[in-house]
């Protein structure tokens, strides 16, 4: 049995989009903000006019590239907002806010290993892929529990590419080493159906 639909909006372009910014708290560019706004407006227009809101609640990563947009949207739509650090992007350690070309110039072998086998190789002083998975799944389990308690039908989560890619791996039952092969475009929505058995299913249009 389905519990609720989870729409995840990835933040738009940021000031450091050319780098690995995981826990780095950089701001959206004007283009990035507008991209997110257009995506939400498109989704609302597809839903049409109704006395009921499209979402029951908005949940956001605590990083400003998600949180500030989420706050403004919650005010506009008059929806409750929760800020949950469990849905923050992966922490890249010494590679935080560093251009990938610079990383490749300094540590080509480690970067290649990380791209190919992220469960076995992590950036120096970074969160491991297993730690990242554990954190995000913990956040999802908490969200599922709240959805059951409050009978939420549809939740909007404003989060990051890594979170979306991880949930796609889980939904498609792909190995975690495939996470970097998954798509998660800036400023775009990806939708999942959460089942009562805590299973997650990716909606067809997002495959």
Language model features: what each stretch is:
Residues 2, 50-86, 112, 193-207:
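Conserved histidine-centered catalytic loops in small-molecule metabolism enzymes
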Residues 9-79:
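Active-site-proximal alpha-helix that buttresses catalytic centers in soluble enzyme cores
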Residues 60-61, 134, 158-159:
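Short beta-strand scaffold positions
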Residues 75-137:
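Phosphate-handling substructures
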